[in-house]
Amino acid sequence: MPLTDPAKLQIVQQRVFLKKVCRKCGALNPIRATKCRRCHSTNLRLKKKELPTKKG
């Protein structure tokens, strides 16, 4: 079910995309994290910010 309401879409994007991903173990971390919560590595990246497109 695609979202058409811009306000709801913005809320979903903030919940889903404002995360950091550990490059060592793949754990999701808060956006303000400096170390991974699982393996304590400092090698973090931002989650990729693109919505999946509907194929068809």
Curated annotation (Swiss-Prot):
GO cellular component: ribonucleoprotein complex; ribosome
SUPFAM superfamilies reported for this sequence: Zn-binding ribosomal proteins
GO biological process: translation
Molecular function in Gene Ontology: structural constituent of ribosome
Domain of life: Archaea
Sorted UniProt keywords: Ribonucleoprotein, Ribosomal protein
Positions of transmembrane segments: none
Pfam families in alphabetical order: Ribosomal_L40e
InterPro entries: Ribosomal_eL40_arc, Ribosomal_eL40_dom, Ribosomal_eL40_sf, Ribosomal_zn-bd
PANTHER family in alphabetical order: 50S RIBOSOMAL PROTEIN L40E (PTHR39649), LARGE RIBOSOMAL SUBUNIT PROTEIN EL40 (PTHR39649:SF1)
Family of this protein: Belongs to the eukaryotic ribosomal protein eL40 family.
Protein name listed in UniProt: Large ribosomal subunit protein eL40
Organism: Saccharolobus solfataricus (strain ATCC 35092 / DSM 1617 / JCM 11322 / P2)
